[in-house]
Amino acid sequence: MSGTLALTETLIGRASVTPDDQNCQHLLVERLSAIGFECETIESNGVTNLWAVKRGAAGKEGKLLAFAGHTDVVPTGPAEQWSSAPFEPTHRDGKLYGRGAADMKASIAGFVVASEEFVAAHPQHRGSLALLITSDEEGPATDGTVKVVDALEARGERMDYCVVGEPTSSVRFGDMVKNGRRGSMSGKLTVKGVQGHIAYPHLAKNPVHLLAPALAELVAEHWDEGNEYFPPTTWQVSNLHSGTGATNIIPGHAEVMFNFRFSTASTVEGLQSRVHQILDKQGLDYDLTWTVSGLPFLTPRGELSNALEKAIYDETGIATELSTTGGTSDGRFIARICKQVIEFGPLNASIHKIDEHIEVAHIEPLKNVYRRVLEQLIA
């Protein structure tokens, strides 16, 4: 059994349902300290975070390449629906099954072993390497990576390159990397009416009827054209609620929750302003609160993307695709202190599902891609 596979299995065996790390990071600290990493644990509201750095010969003058990952996993769902126990790593049909196998314990194991091999082969490596690991990525993500980034920013520390170990491969291992992500902004809209008997509408004011024209306009609105890296911005309703459950009462208010996934072609302020304009045009009496979960970020082609593309091609023979599709990731926080952030990891078809798995044959190539990137950029 390879060292990467063994470490992946050990990590899967720890039931680190968010935000519980289950001492996964303690295991990583043992491995990393043994090869010269300085390890710092940053805890916040029950969340465990790790910042581990191994300085190169050039010290702080050299480039720093970091790996970002998360030890927490999503809940398993009904355990009885799994073909094998979700926290007992199980081999079947050439696959390794277990919660976190693809998202993202194999990636963490791959980078740790890649680091061990890299340091052994290049004991005088010029650049520095680091790992930023959290147990709060699958949850609210308020006490995880963002807290480490806050601490690093306060100390004036930056990264030159960051590889996030998210499972980005789509159909074939290595076929896609993420060089950016859309921003995410949610709104909670409450439209006020006047409650009354449904037989006497002239004595009431139905907030659903008042809301409907504005809702139709928001649905039909063309927010932007996108750009060469991002698709057009989207607006979607996630929740719609009004009424008491009775059939003879006109409700007193209607509540809508919605979400923008937006590109660098739009801004938070611009989108918020346009929503308010549409609501105000309809003369609505409303309250609207906003939550910005993350801003869009983009890493144009450069040293990191070139190194990763070459590493993937040399290892797999695949010309990978740069993409910004999908949801948000912790890359949105890291982009504050790192100009080159790219995500790469295994196939994502089974993540968050019953019987999550990774192809065993992909585990060593994953580690090898990470090592090739280290060798190109900081050896």
From Swiss-Prot:
Co-factor(s): Zn(2+); Co(2+)
Biological process annotations from GO: diaminopimelate biosynthetic process; L-arginine biosynthetic process; lysine biosynthetic process via diaminopimelate
Protein source organism: Paraburkholderia phymatum (strain DSM 17167 / CIP 108236 / LMG 21445 / STM815) (Burkholderia phymatum)
Family (UniProt): Belongs to the peptidase M20A family. DapE subfamily.
Name this polypeptide is given: Succinyl-diaminopimelate desuccinylase
Annotated positions binding Zn(2+) 1: 70, 103, 166
UniProt-listed InterPro entries: ArgE/DapE_CS (IPR001261), Bact_exopeptidase_dim_dom (IPR036264), DapE_proteobac (IPR005941), Peptidase_M20 (IPR002933), Peptidase_M20_dimer (IPR011650), Peptidase_M20A (IPR050072)
Catalytic activity: N-succinyl-(2S,6S)-2,6-diaminopimelate + H2O = (2S,6S)-2,6-diaminopimelate + succinate
Location of the active site: 72, 137 (proton acceptor)
Gene, per the UniProt record: dapE
Quaternary structure and partners: Homodimer.
Cofactor descriptive note: Binds 2 Zn(2+) or Co(2+) ions per subunit.
Keyword presence, Zinc: yes
